[in-house]
């Protein structure tokens, strides 16, 4: 943060304590009272101002990803992909773009331990010369549900019981038993990767398919992958309990201390690309957010590196007020038809307006670092001083005009208006393939987690049978092992 820009200039600074209006404060310890024992007088303006400010100094926490930590750095292109995209920040090897990155847990509150089993958020804001690009992802490549109509229920099921405020397995397994597509995400959620050692040792994924468009207008679907150069490291359940009991902010501290010591975290960015003409060649829908793309058919392509080399200057200003939005894209990158992505474009901006205010994009951490101009005006906590006489467009008195058209996908979309699921669900194949790729001890930890969750006394026989059926359809031996430890017969 630039002190000369975001703090009072030296011409107006003072070594003495003042009110917000600049009036001198000569006592910051004792309230103004009638006699030494009181009562307190309401005319003690600074007391009232101090308390009123304190009462309002926090904003509503994020409904998800409330617990998190941020750091700043740069993204550098290392490999030429200009044949795939006309995005300026990806224009050529050596090009650098300033970034801010936020890591988080998903479900629990702002002060919760960072060692709990949970998906982690991995969000990167690129301050490009063409506007901000927000790649808002997680440390797993898939999500529980493919349609946003289920998203609020998904989060409520994962969050604590509204009566007791305790996270309970029976609620999670009850809800997701109606969403068989969630099994693939459970193959990550109940796996080691949802107990990362810290933020530096975890992968990141854009999760959704996007589109890259080159200067000729040719589009390719794309998925983004972040690979940590220091490798992936995870904790056991026992280690997580010990670490969380010792320091509930262990991952934040590790990130901060590593950067302060000059041990800068680094990730390599890879992409997978797919020609839109090949979408129907797979036994699943490539735009289904509950699926991954096979790397043997669509190999990882190296793009660049992300280096975090600066700690934030103020946690509230650059972490709590930091706002991401998948709707923030730049020329050369576009959305896919992924149903969940399409609705996140609206939902993220909406929640930031509620959480921070309608002018959240004017905050330094959120504002683009390139020129920007529109007629979005005024509103609560507006921080701009504009003296234009014309606040409409078009106008012969204002030289502002629409930007030149940049390439966007030109595919033809058609179909009946309907509420339905996608044709190729294929809910279990990839979950089974992931399970079979593990060593036996890792499989055993996964099975034990299922047994522990399904042993919740409020999980009914019906719910257990449904989940054993799902697990058996993914991998017969996995379902049998869970069933045998629960003494429940698998049903197909």
Curated annotation (Swiss-Prot):
Write out the catalysed reaction. 2 H2O2 = O2 + 2 H2O
Biological processes annotated in GO: hydrogen peroxide catabolic process; response to hydrogen peroxide
Q: Which Pfam families match?
A: Catalase, Catalase-rel
The answer to keyword Metal-binding applying to this record is: yes
Question: What PROSITE patterns does the database record attribute to this sequence?
Answer: CATALASE_1, CATALASE_2, CATALASE_3
Keywords, A to Z?
Heme, Hydrogen peroxide, Iron, Metal-binding, Oxidoreductase, Peroxidase, Peroxisome
Q: Does the keyword Oxidoreductase apply?
A: yes
Q: Which InterPro entries match?
A: Catalase, Catalase_AS, Catalase_clade1/3, Catalase_core, Catalase_haem_BS, Catalase_immune_responsive, Catalase_sf
Q: What is its EC number?
A: 1.11.1.6
Gene Ontology terms, cellular component aspect? cytoplasm; peroxisome; plasma membrane
Q: Where in the cell is it found?
A: Peroxisome
Cofactor requirements of the protein: heme
Q: Where does heme bind?
A: 348
SUBUNIT field: Homotetramer.
PANTHER family reported in the protein's UniProt record: CATALASE, CATALASE ISOZYME 1
| Family membership | Belongs to the catalase family.
Indicate what this protein is called per its UniProt record.
Catalase isozyme 1
Per UniProt, what is the name of the gene that codes for the protein in this document? CAT1
């Amino acid at each position: 943060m630039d002190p000369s820009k975001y703090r009072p200039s030296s011409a107006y600074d003072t070594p003495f304590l003042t009110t917000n209006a600049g009036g001198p404060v000569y006592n910051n310890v004792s309230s103004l009272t009638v006699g030494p024992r009181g009562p307190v007088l309401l005319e003690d303006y600074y007391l009232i101002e101090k308390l009123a400010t304190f009462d309002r100094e926090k904003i509503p926490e994020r409904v998800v990803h409330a617990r998190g930590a941020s750091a700043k750095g740069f993204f550098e292109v290392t490999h030429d992909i200009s044949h795939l995209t006309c995005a300026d920040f990806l224009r050529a090897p050596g090009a650098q773009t300033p970034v801010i990155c936020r890591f988080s847990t998903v479900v629990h509150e702002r002060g919760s331990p960072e060692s709990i089993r949970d998906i982690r958020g991995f969000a990167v804001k690129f301050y490009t010369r063409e506007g901000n690009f927000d790649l808002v992802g997680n440390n797993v490549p898939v999500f529980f549900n493919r349609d946003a109509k289920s998203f609020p229920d998904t989060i409520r099921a994962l969050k604590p019981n509204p009566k007791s405020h305790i996270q309970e397995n029976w609620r999670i397994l009850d809800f997701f038993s109606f969403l068989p597509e969630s099994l693939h995400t459970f193959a990550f959620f109940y796996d080691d990767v949802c107990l990362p050692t810290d933020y530096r040792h975890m992968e990141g994924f854009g999760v959704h398919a996007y589109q890259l468009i080159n200067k000729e207008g040719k589009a390719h679907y794309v998925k983004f992958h972040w690979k940590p150069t220091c490798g992936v490291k995870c904790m056991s359940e026992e280690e997580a309990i010990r670490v969380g009991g010792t320091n509930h902010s262990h991952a934040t501290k590790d990130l901060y201390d590593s950067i302060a010591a000059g041990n800068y975290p680094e990730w390599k960015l890879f992409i997978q690309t797919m020609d839109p003409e090949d979408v129907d060649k797979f036994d699943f829908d490539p735009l289904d957010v509950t699926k991954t793309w096979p790397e043997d058919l669509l190999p990882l392509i190296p793009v660049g590196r992300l280096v975090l080399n600066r700690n934030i200057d103020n946690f509230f200003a650059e972490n709590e007020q930091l706002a991401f939005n998948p709707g923030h894209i730049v020329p050369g990158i576009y959305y896919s038809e992924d149903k969940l992505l399409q609705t996140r474009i609206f939902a993220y901006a909406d929640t930031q307006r509620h959480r921070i205010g309608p002018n959240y994009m004017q905050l330094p951490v959120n504002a683009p670092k390139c020129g920007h101009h529109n007629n979005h005006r005024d509103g609560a906590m507006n921080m701009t001083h504009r003296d234009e006489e014309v606040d409409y467009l078009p106008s012969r008195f204002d030289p502002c005009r629409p930007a030149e058209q940049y390439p966007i996908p030109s595919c033809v979309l058609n179909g009946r208006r309907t509420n339905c699921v996608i044709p190729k669900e294929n809910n279990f194949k990839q979950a089974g393939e992931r399970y079979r790729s593990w060593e036996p001890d890792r499989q055993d930890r996964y099975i034990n987690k299922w047994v522990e969750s399904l042993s919740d006394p409020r999980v009914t026989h019906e719910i257990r049978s449904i989940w054993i059926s799902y697990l058996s359809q993914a991998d017969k031996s996995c379902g049998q092992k869970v069933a045998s430890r629960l003494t429940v017969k698998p049903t197909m």
